[in-house]
Amino acid sequence: GTHPCQETCVTSTRCSTQGCHCNWPICFKN
């Protein structure tokens, strides 16, 4: 699917974009 939060992440980091969560290896909209 799509992930409108254009950010990569690791399990120990939080996504800087508000309303997004980390689902390794990218951030997804909540």
Curated annotation (Swiss-Prot):
Organism, as annotated: Pigea enneasperma (Spade flower)
Instruction: List the protein's name.
Output: Cyclotide hyen-C
TM spans (from-to): none
What does the tissue specificity note say? Detected in stems (at protein level).
- What residues does the Cyclopeptide (Gly-Asn) crosslink join? 1-30
What the record says about its domains?
The presence of a 'disulfide through disulfide knot' structurally defines this protein as a knottin.
Detail the disulphide connectivity of this chain as listed in its UniProt entry: 5-20, 9-22, 15-27
Enumerate the InterPro entries for this protein: Cyclotide (IPR005535), Cyclotide_sf (IPR036146)
Q: What family does this belong to?
A: Belongs to the cyclotide family.
Q: Which UniProt keywords apply?
A: Disulfide bond, Knottin, Plant defense
This molecule's function is given as:
Probably participates in a plant defense mechanism. Does not display any cytotoxic activity towards K562, HeLa, MCF-7, HUVEC or red blood cells. Does not bind to phospholipd membranes containing 1-palmitoyl 2-oleoyl phosphatidylcholine (POPC) or 1-palmitoyl-2-oleophosphatidylethanolamine (POPE).
Please outline how this chain is modified post-translation: This is a cyclic peptide.
Can the keyword Calcium be found in this entry's annotation? no
Biological process, per Gene Ontology: cytolysis in another organism; defense response
